[in-house]
Design a protein with these regions (language model features):
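Structured, charged N-terminal subsegments at the starts of enzyme catalytic cores
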Residues: 194-299
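Aspartic protease catalytic domain
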Residues: 2-31
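Structured nucleic-acid-interacting core domains from mobile-element enzymes and related host factors
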Residues: 328-365
């Protein structure tokens, strides 16, 4: 049995919530056969130290990294041409002192009165300015993020308002879906919100909320169950059985003959399309299946490594991938079979994690959600016709929300979308506001919807059943004051002069948000409240969102299947290489989806000619994401020219 002192030790840690064990007679053999008691005591001691560190004030440990700050900070500050808003002028004075070596720990006017830094700075020895230097750099970082400090001639860290389109260009753009006068927008939204709150109140009293209820001020809503009709799965299997097996090389040739996507890869100097189509498709295939050019040269019967390198350097770049993808997506949308799945006016977006090499650039970060291995995310937009019309590489730890509008506005396919679905990770009030102003119906599946608060223009006038759900009052005055700049933000996003994610990240970056960011959040709260009421009362909206998100998640499985080489890891060490790898993977997925859509359509047409009519309701559940009939492995042989 476990010695008494050890059992007491385990019980004490169990009370702290650190471990949970059965009585000694049960757990003794399990521990002995595992790490052993010595190993357990080591793990408990390590957990105790980690718990104490995590519970401690982080500022007690920042001096441990002081040497890293000193390695780059003085040179960096000498090179940067900084500008600041009035609120950040005290910080700029402290930066100037640090830059010139006049480190004065008494210069603390840049700190907020309630800042924890004051207590830690007072505890430092006289003449020790190390913690003060770190405080200046931390606050400089936050000021960059909030836009209170900016760099001249910088696109990412420049003055946000200088990057926005001028006010007179708003009316000329014609892309905004809201009135130019804030009074009109506020009057419309107040009338609409009051009406929808009354409708929700009546449904709550009558008990007619679909799959949900509001009881004692608490919202309850059930998750929709899958609603695939009987026979859909059998139909999918039957249709795919009639598609002949094919090699990926033959598939690429057939899709290029139908779409001409290789024409998009023009010479960087002359602008002429690549004359060596087979070589170009070898390069695209090497990126798409995550094989790499050197191993592709060993696996193909047509080109050497140096020939593939030459083609890749002169013809393959990001814009070429975007053009080729647009050609394939447009061609797939024109196929008759695609109409059974949708009209190309709704889409879903989601991030997919890929393990990356330890020695890459800044994209390779550890996100505990995916384990302890560094990686990156491919954030993709998939239309209701299954076409992956946009993808981009983002850090594994980044919020997905700011990138939603990038995929919708940075290419033509996204501009046809009217309703955008996403999961909880893609939702913020800023995104709700920007999507509504630009005319998109933003419909996220919010995991903890019952805990989210509604907002009203007049909370006291809300139905009694709903008052416990009201989180606050909409600040109309703040919206009115900032309406011109809100429209400038939206017009700038629509014009494509600045990436939407760049603007939204900056607005959301700082805890003490500036008034413009807060005003945009107020607009988003109004739009989110309207959406939440729609979601609660409309089971069909919930079902559409579920179907859209399922299409995106199924698309992830196809990408996993085609990127099987190198264990699915993205081992490129540069951000550019990672981008090309993900872009190649997305293009190859789109090519397979086009080919499957074409072949499924041919099978359906043949059955129709034979007098066998298939139900459109069943065909809507057929997916072009199958790959079992495609030979992705082995040697990649092409017909001789």
């Amino acid at each position: 049995k476990m010695p008494a002192f050890e059992w007491v030790h385990v019980q004490l840690h169990q009370q702290k919530g650190m471990i949970s064990l059965s009585p000694p007679t049960i757990c003794n053999s399990a521990i002995a056969s595992g790490s052993g008691w010595d190993g357990l005591k080591t793990l408990v001691a390590m957990a105790t130290r980690l718990t104490a560190t995590m519970a401690d004030d982080p500022l007690n440990h920042v001096l441990d990294g002081y040497h890293r700050f000193r390695r780059y900070a003085p040179r960096m500050l000498r090179l940067l041409d900084l500008r600041a808003a009035p609120v950040a002028l005290p910080l700029l004075e402290a930066v100037t002192a640090l830059r010139t070596g006049l480190n004065d720990a008494a210069m603390t006017s840049f700190l907020r009165p309630s800042s924890k830094w004051h207590r830690h700075l007072r505890a430092q020895r006289a003449g020790d300015a190390r913690l003060w230097e770190i405080a200046v750099l931390f606050h400089l970082r936050d000021a960059f993020r909030s836009g209170d400090v900016w760099l001249t001639r910088s696109r990412r860290y420049g003055d946000l308002k200088h990057a926005l389109v001028p006010a007179q260009a708003i009316a000329e753009g014609g892309r905004l879906a809201v009135p130019l006068r804030p009074e009109e927008w506020l009057a419309d939204r107040q009338a609409r919100l009051d009406m929808r709150l009354r409708e929700l109140g009546r449904a709550a009293r009558a008990g007619t909320i679909p799959g949900g209820s509001i009881e004692n001020g608490v919202l309850h809503i059930e998750k929709l169950e899958a609603a695939a009709p009987t026979g859909a799965e059998d139909l999918v299997l039957d249709l795919y059985k009639q598609i002949p097996p094919t090699r990926i090389t033959d598939l690429l040739l057939e899709v290029d003959a139908a779409t001409g996507f290789t024409e998009a890869f023009t010479h960087l100097r002359t602008g002429a399309p690549c004359a060596d189509r087979i070589g170009l498709m070898n390069v695209i295939l090497a990126e798409g299946i995550n094989l790499g050019l050197r191993k592709m040269a060993d696996a193909t019967n047509t080109h050497t490594f140096w020939e593939l390198i030459r083609i890749g350097r002169w013809h393959v770049e990001g814009e070429a991938y975007d053009r080729a993808l647009a050609m394939v997506v447009e061609a797939q949308a024109a196929l008759p079979m695609a109409r059974f799945w949708g009209m190309g006016t709704s889409a879903s977006s989601d991030g997919q994690f890929f393990v990356a090499t330890e020695q890459g650039e800044a994209m390779n970060l550890v996100n505990a959600k995916y384990g302890n291995t560094p990686g990156l995310k491919a954030y993709s937009h998939v239309s209701d016709q299954y076409a992956p019309f946009a993808t981009q590489v983002i850090p594994a730890t980044a919020s997905e929300a700011p990138y939603i509008l990038d995929g919708l506005l940075m290419n033509d396919a996204g501009r046809h979308i009217r309703e955008q679905f996403t999961d909880t990770g893609g939702f913020t009030d800023h995104v709700f506001a920007a999507c509504a102003i630009l005319g998109y119906r933003f419909a996220p599946r919010i995991r903890d919807l019952p805990s989210k608060r509604l907002y009203a223009f007049n909370p006291s006038a809300a139905p009694a059943h709903l008052r416990a759900l009201i989180g606050g009052k909409v600040n109309q005055a703040m919206i009115e004051r900032n309406w011109p700049d809100i429209l400038r933000i939206a017009a700038t996003i629509a014009a494509g002069t600045v990436a939407p994610s760049q603007i939204l990240r900056k607005l959301a970056s700082y805890p003490r948000q500036n008034e413009l960011a807060t005003a945009l959040r107020e607009v988003g709260r109004v739009e989110r409240t309207l959406f939440m009421i729609d979601w609660i009362l409309d089971a069909e909206l919930q079902r559409r969102a579920q179907i859209g998100l399922n299409k995106g998640e199924a698309h992830h499985a196809l990408k996993r299947a085609i990127s099987f080489h190198r264990r699915g890891e993205i081992r490129d060490r540069s951000a550019e290489g990672q981008h090309y790898r993900i872009a190649g993977m997305n293009l190859l997925a789109a090519i397979i989806i086009f080919w499957n859509t074409m072949k499924l359509g041919e099978v359906v047409a043949n059955q129709k000619r034979d007098g066998k009519l298939l139900s459109p309701d069943l065909l809507a559940h057929v997916s072009p994401l199958g790959w079992e009939h495609i030979n992705l492995t082995g040697e990649y042989r092409w017909p001789k020219p």
